[in-house]
Amino acid sequence: MGSVNGYLATHAAIALVVGTVLAGLAELFFPRFVNRTVHRIRRGFILDPLVNLMKGETSLHIAVATTTHPAFHRLGSGDPITLPENAPFLPFGQAMGMADLRGAVNDRYGKKRSVEIDYADRFGLGWKHSFVALGGPYVHPIVKDVLDRGLVQGFAVEDGPVVKDEGERFHASRDGTTPESPLTTDIGVIIWMRNPYNESRKLCILFGLWPPGTFAAVDAFLNRSVADAKLQRKFRRLVRSGQDCVAIVETSISALTIGVPTIRKVRSFTYQHRPTSPAP
């Protein structure tokens, strides 16, 4: 047994020495290649929007929309069961998005960072931090406040619902014409901007016209899987350069399966300071 351990230790030491020598030779004879590779690795980390959102923060703060189902009916019984206020049924796209955001923080930072989640209308002092607002203006008071005040120039959500951005209209599609007809595509929105309640911090708004679009927006923000790499890089460059920007995302839907999001449009906008009131 001792000889086996000695053999493994010897070969591990040899591998370490050889690796160090090869790395040194590569840097000596191919410095431009090494520097370029290191630069790309660092640049990929710096361009990660999540990293930019977490600057100066010990937690990722998430304000979720207040659309919940406070009760449900047990199978075989007509009596409703009331849910605790902190154990709601959430729209599945929002719930999946929250899980992905938490997972991304854990993957990136481990135990060095935490995730704090609360309802938007009970967010307390969370709005003083850089934070994520998860949900659209129909159900999320913070997002409604931002859009009602015209802080995102050229952008609006109209009845339908329809996203209107600089004259372009983006809408979901259905397999049918009735209100309950299933979705075949949905639109997600990413808004990256200065936090209007504390302009030294950032606000990231993620929502969809319907719940699948919310999940698609989170997916695109985290760059888990995006069909258009060129626009994804453009979005990341705008975030890295400190510019406020909007990204419009589209995804396909089959039953409850949400497809790979495609970024349809990315643009920057100029934030205009306006007198702020306490967060809603």
Residue spans for each PLM region:
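Solvent-exposed alpha-helical segments and adjacent loops
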Residues: 33-280
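Hydrophobic, helix-forming membrane-interacting segments
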Residues: 1-38
